[in-house]
Amino acid sequence: MLHLYNSLTRKKEPFVSLRPGKIGMYVCGITVYDHCHLGHARSMVAFDVMVRYLRSQGFDVTYVRNITDIDDKIIARASERDVSIDELTAQYIDAMNNDTHALNILPPDHEPRATGHIETIIRLIQRLLEKGSAYVSENGDVCYEVDTFPEYGKLSHKDIEGLVSGSRVEIVKEKRSPLDFVLWKKAKPGEPSWPSPWGEGRPGWHIECSAMAMHELGEQFDIHGGGLDLQFPHHENEIAQSEAATGKPFANYWLHVGMLQVNGEKMAKSIGNFYTIADVLKEHHPEVIRYFLLSSHYRSPLNYSEENLLNAKKALIRLYQAVKDVPPQTADSKLDEYWQEQFNQAMNDDFNTPVALSVLFQLAHEVNKSNSPALAHTLKNLAGILGFLQKDPESFLQSGLAEEEKLVIEQLIAERLQARAERNWAKADQIRTDLLSKGIELEDGATGTTWRRIAE
């Protein structure tokens, strides 16, 4: 049975969906004011694997991942570049789609944008005002009153009294409490705005996600996810406003992905230590990046380094070598039940991908020993749930080399062939040895000599 670590209760719990066989999952997507970095990729890959696994277990998953396309950062960036907000967001949505496609991240079933749900957002704010959970502040903003929700802090387990006492005094001038947050921002000159019962304005970030999640999945759903940095205040605020409006639990399970770090610090645009997905893809195969991102449990911090990416590459090479000579899968090919069960046990333990990867390596060892097509197909199938081992083995094993390097290898193979024709075995053996020392393995066959990269 699947067990998930629920941030709300701080413990692993058996997963029971609201509707048998069906799962509603909402994940906070990106704010499109810049290119996605590898920290975004970690979250997207983690939830991609969760969806793939749940579907492999027979669940009908409705996966929603939003796009925040109106925000202070977007407005500021568009102004800096002297472009329209629509032009800016379209550019980065296209870039995100290119990144996710390259990383073999499945598209969500629904990808709502905040600007497409203004009426839904306004209706939700009206409900909160009617229930006395929100108020119109002196400056014309509509704010949520945190003190009206006694359970505020139940997700992040923050010391709310401490947060209030540590807040800046000037915020209180516009809000009844420093922790109150904006649901609707009064329009400012030159900023995009929409008509509302409270005048022209635009939605706050937190209310956008609640409104879009409810629109796509209903007032209650199974899983809400996002990065650990969103737990407070974003997800805390989502719970407060959603449950105040409906009187029902918002999401039953809250899953949070740990931070990707660089030298012990969170990778973030604000710090300036981030690597864009596009830049990392220039240097590393997409499957290598996926493997690296899954090499640590999704809740644990993961350190970015070239060494860790190299280790991921070596690991994938070993897996590809195990399946490189396997005949194509046929319609009646069956998967090995024992290894399926071992893999499922790992994934049922809160999507424990490091243990699942160790199962794949044990299976690869058995494939190498037995050369069993059934085991090899099982290996490819299980790895496919993690989103890799899906390329042509020869193509992958030759990837990562510049065309000039490939030409040099082909030239050396030709020289070796000539040496063998001249019965100069010493030279032929030396060429093989030299290439092997560079991580290039030669294989002689009836149709000629082929080569592949190997784990050094």
Curated annotation (Swiss-Prot):
- Where do the coiled-coil regions begin and end? none
Q: What is its EC number?
A: 6.1.1.16
Keywords in alphabetical order: Aminoacyl-tRNA synthetase, ATP-binding, Cytoplasm, Ligase, Metal-binding, Nucleotide-binding, Protein biosynthesis, Zinc
This protein's species is Legionella pneumophila (strain Corby)
Q: Where does it reside? A: Cytoplasm
Subunit: Monomer.
- What HAMAP family would the database entry show? Cys_tRNA_synth
Cofactors named for this entry: Zn(2+)
Motif 'KMSKS' region extends across 266-270
The top EC class, named as a word, is: ligase
Q: How is the cofactor bound?
A: Binds 1 zinc ion per subunit.
Among InterPro entries, the record links this protein to: Cys-tRNA-ligase, Cys-tRNA-synt_Ia_DALR, Cys-tRNA/MSH_ligase, CysS_C, Rossmann-like_a/b/a_fold, tRNA-synt_1_cat_dom, tRNAsynth_Ia_anticodon-bd
Protein's name according to its UniProt entry: Cysteine--tRNA ligase
GO cellular component terms, alphabetically, are: cytosol
Any idea which positions bind Zn(2+)? 28, 209, 234, 238
- Catalysed transformations (reactions): tRNA(Cys) + L-cysteine + ATP = L-cysteinyl-tRNA(Cys) + AMP + diphosphate
